[in-house]
Structures are given as C-alpha cells and as structure tokens.
Amino acid sequence: MSEPQPGLEPPQHGLYMLFLLVLVFFLMGLVGFMICHVLKKKGYRCRTSRGSEPDDAQLQPPEDDDVNEDTVERIVRCIIQNEANAEALKEMLGDSEGEGTVQLSSVDATSSLQDGAPSHHHTVHLGSAAPCIHCSRSKRPPLVRQGRSKEGKGRPRPGETTVFSVGRFRVTHIEKRYGLHEHRDGSPTDRSWGSGGGQEPGVSQVAGGQPRTGTAAIERLLPEPPPSQAAATHPVQNGRLKDASLVPCTLEGTPGTSAELNVGTRGTGPSPGLPSQEANGQPTKLDTSGQQDSLPPEAGGM
C-alpha cells in the first residue's frame, strides 16, 4: 500500500479560500455603504478621514434677515412672491400704483439687473391695459419694506398708568371710574328729591332760604274726579230735571210714575254734596230726605 506524501497539497483548497475572502470583503463594503446611507438620511455625517470635514459655514443654517418678522407678514410675503398672485393684485389695483405695494424677492431683483432682459415669458392680459408685472419692475423704484406703525402702540389711554413693560408685554393700571350717581366713598346718591338739590324729604325751604322741618317737601295734587256720565247727559238740580223736554209726555199725566222717575234720576246722578267721598273711593249714600221735595205738586194734592 502506498502512503500519501506530506509535501503535496491539493491545489483546489487554496482557490476556494481566495474566492471566499473576496466575497466576504465585498459583502462588508456593501453593508458599510448601506449603513452610511441610512445614517446620512437621519442627519449623521460619515467621513473617512479628518481632512475631509465639511466647513462650518456650510453646516450652519442660512440666517434670516427678518428675525422679528411676524407670521402674518411671512404669509403675506409668500402670497405676494407668487407670480400669479402678484399679477392678480396688480389688476385689482389698476392705475393707482402708489397705493399698491408689491414686495419683490432679492434673488429676482439681482437676476433681472444682471441679465438686463426679463427671464420670463411675457404674459398678455386679455381685455386689460395693465402691463406685465415682470416688465414693470424696471420702471418702478426699489420698494422698501413697510413695517407696522408703532405710533398707536405707545399712546396711553386716559386713566391708564403703565406699571411694567417688556417688549410687547405691558402691564397697565386702570383707575376705577365712578358713575354719575355714586360718590367716591361708594355710597349711591339719591336724585329723587326734585329741584331741592339733594334735600331731605323732611326739610323744606321757606322764602328766606332757611330750611324748615316738619313739612313735606313734595306736595302731590289729587287728581280731579272725572264727571259722571249721568250728570253730563241728564243735568239735575235739586232732584229735578232742568230741561222739561227730557221727560216723556206719556208720563206727565201719572204723578206716581213721574215721582219714581225723579227719584231714580236722583239716585243715578252724583250727589252735589259728596264730592270728597267719591274722590276718596267711598261709596255715596242716597239721601231720601229730599224725596218729598222732588214730588210734583199734583202728587201732594192727591
């Protein structure tokens, strides 16, 4: 039996190892590239040496000139910078160029000055005499950014005292305003005493100007009682009718009916001697003592 010689090695074993190493290095490079790509998307920086560091000026964000600009001003500027919105604004303003303020970006202004010719397609406004907004830029003077007027902000209102002020934050003290019917001490005034000028109800003034107590300051007049309807329509004097024509002719022959009519007329009419009772709301009582006088002479004869 022949034994294998120790100096001879199979040649295929070294070739396999070479292919395996190349494949491992290729996979490692591919994985590293993918890792750097993912980290770059997340905001990380991947560099191979210290000499290839980027400049600090490129990493810093661009500084905004208008740091104190409000949100509303930013929105207005974005709207005006749009070409379509600027053209619509120009058409709305019409010929009054002094009133309209169109803010132009610095990039468009420098490009138009350097090139000398408008770098846009000329738009033709159908049915309008307004020129193109891009062509009219060279004719206009450079516009200045208009800020908010601060004249009205510093004016203090009447009755206000500024206690603390930082920027737009301000603390003011407002004095309490008293009403027309209230004193400084908080007690309300009573203006119901008429022309007496706050005079007490139990004190009145005499002709000499000295106050006099014990009399009422306000005198109320009692309303006059309205005339009765029966008295207005049927005038009565001493229990008899003044006008004899009001008595029916058919009742003249019968003294009893005429007496009853006179008594009923006296009862319906107001009593001349009791005006105060009717005014005070008390019922009047009929006085029957005068019935004998109200009877005609014919009834007495019978």
UniProtKB/Swiss-Prot annotation:
Q: Which UniProt keywords apply?
A: Cell membrane, Membrane, Phosphoprotein, Transmembrane, Transmembrane helix
| InterPro entries found in the cross-reference section | RELL2 (IPR042313), TNF_rcpt_RELT (IPR022248)
Q: Topology with regard to the membrane?
A: Single-pass membrane protein
Where would you find the membrane-spanning parts of this chain? 15-35
Q: Which pairs of positions does the record mark as disulfide bonds? A: none
Localization: Cell membrane
Residue numbers of Phosphoserine PTMs? 52
Q: Which Pfam families match?
A: RELT
The answer to keyword Transmembrane helix applying to this record is yes
One annotated GO molecular function is: collagen binding
* Gene Ontology CC entries for this record: basement membrane; extracellular matrix; plasma membrane
What Gene Ontology terms for biological process does this UniProt record contain?
Answer: positive regulation of cell-substrate adhesion; positive regulation of p38MAPK cascade
Q: Where along the sequence do coiled-coil regions lie?
A: none
- Its chief place of residence is membrane
Which segments show compositional bias classed as Basic and acidic residues? 148-158, 177-188
Q: Where is the region Disordered?
A: 47-68, 135-164, 177-212, 247-302
Which residue intervals are annotated with compositional bias (Polar residues) in the record? 277-294
Asked if the keyword rRNA-binding belongs to this entry, the reply reads: no
Oligomeric state and interaction partners are given as: Interacts with RELT, RELL1, OXSR1, PLSCR1 and TRAF2.
Q: Which family does it belong to?
A: Belongs to the RELT family.
**Function statement:** Induces activation of MAPK14/p38 cascade, when overexpressed. Induces apoptosis, when overexpressed.
Protein's name in the database: RELT-like protein 2
Q: Which organism is it from?
A: Rattus norvegicus
